[in-house]
Amino acid sequence: MATDDDGTPNWSELVTDILSLVFKHLSFTDFARAKTVCSSWYFASKSSSPRKNHTPWLILYQDTHWLMFNSDEEKFYRTVYLGRFAECRGVASCGSWVLVFDKEINFYIINPFTPQLIRLPPLEYSNTGTKFERPGNYVFHLLFDDRHRTSRAIVGNSVLWVDEKTKDYLVVWSYKEAFVPSPYIYYCSKRGQEWFEIPASTCGKLFRCLDMAYKDEKLYILTSNGSIRILDFSLGDLPRQIDNHPYSHRPFVTEFPNHKMGMRLTTSGDVVMIQCVTTGTHKRSPFRIFKLSSITETKESSHEVVGWETVHSFEDEESLVWDLSVTLPTKGVSGIKKDSIYYCHTSLSSSIRETCAYEIPTHKITAYDIPKQDIKPIRHRGILIGEARWFVPCFGAGE
C-alpha cells in the first residue's frame, strides 16, 4: 500500500481487486458510505456489489426530501433534494426502485439513493381506447367509449419489477372508484412504452381486483370472487393466461370479508393469504395467514377436496414486509426476524401511525419510534396520501 510522506497509509491507493473483495462483504449502508470516501473508491464500487440486503427500510415523505429509516440500525437517512418529486407518492417497490405518481397521475420509477428517474408514458399513450381526465389532486376520471364516465378514481393495487442491470421494467396498476376496487388493470413495460389493459379472464367475466403479486415473470391477481388468475409475461408484452395451476377452481373464501386482505408469494412461489383482523377478539393477533391445504379425501366420497387452512408460520425461514408481494429469507440476515410481518398503518380518523413488526408464533408486536414530525400525510376528500412504506433496498453493480 502506498503511504504519505509521514508514513500514513494512503487508503485511496488500494488496488481495485482488494477494494472489490472488501466491498462484497459490506452491508448495504456501509457500502453506500464507502462509495463516498474518495473518487478511486467510488469508481471501484461501480464494478462491485455489497452483501445482499434483506433488512426492511421505511420511506417517510417530506416537502422536498424523503426520509428513510433503517430498521436494523434504527437510524434515519435523508435523500438528496427531490424537488417536486418529493410530493410523489409511492405505491410499489422493487429493490431500491419505487413506483410513484404525482398529483396529475404521471407515473415515475425513482431510485431515492442515486437518484435515478425513469419517466413512464403518460396515460394518454394507451391502446385501450379509454380516455383519462386528470384534474389533479391525485385523482382522475376515466371515459369509456365516450359514454360512461367514472366518478373520482384513485390509484389502487400496484406492482413493480425492475432488472437492476438492464433497467428493464414492468409496471402494473389498478384503480379504485369511490373506494371500490375496479376490474380494470393496466400495465406498461420498457419495450412497449405505452399502456395496455389486462384482458378479461378466459371466462369473459369481470371481477374486481383485490390484490396483485409478481414473481418469476408471472402476475398473480386476486379477484373479488376469491379466485386467483395467473398471467405469464415471459413470452413478450402480451401476457398469456395460465388456466391450469394449483389454485384453479379453489377460491379463497373468508369469514371476515370486510377486512383488509393481502395476497403474497413465498420465496418458493406458493400463494399465502394475509388478512388484517384488528377488531373483537383478534386484537392480540392482528393478522391471520392462510395457505392452500394438502389434498384430503372426505368421508362422504372419494373426491379430493382442497381448501385453505390457517397456518402459524411461513415456509422455511422467511418473513413478510406488507408492502412487498414476496416474502424475504431470514436465515443469516440481521435486522429481520423469522415469521414476522412488518407493516405500517395510518388511521384516517386520527392520523395515528403504527409502524410495527408482528411476530406470528408469539403474537409479540414491536413498535418503532417514528417521530410524528417526520411525516406529512396529505389529506384529500377522505384520502390519506403519503403513508410510510416499507421497502427492501439493494445496490446493483454499477450504481
UniProtKB/Swiss-Prot annotation:
InterPro entries tied to this protein: F-box-like_dom_sf, F-box_BR-signaling, F-box_dom, KIB1-4_b-propeller, Quino_amine_DH_bsu
PANTHER family, alphabetized: F-BOX PROTEIN KIB2-RELATED, OS07G0183000 PROTEIN-RELATED
Domain F-box intervals: 9-56
Name this protein carries in UniProt: F-box protein At1g10110
Source organism of the structure: Arabidopsis thaliana (Mouse-ear cress)
UniProt cross-references to Pfam families, sorted A to Z: Beta-prop_KIB1-4, F-box
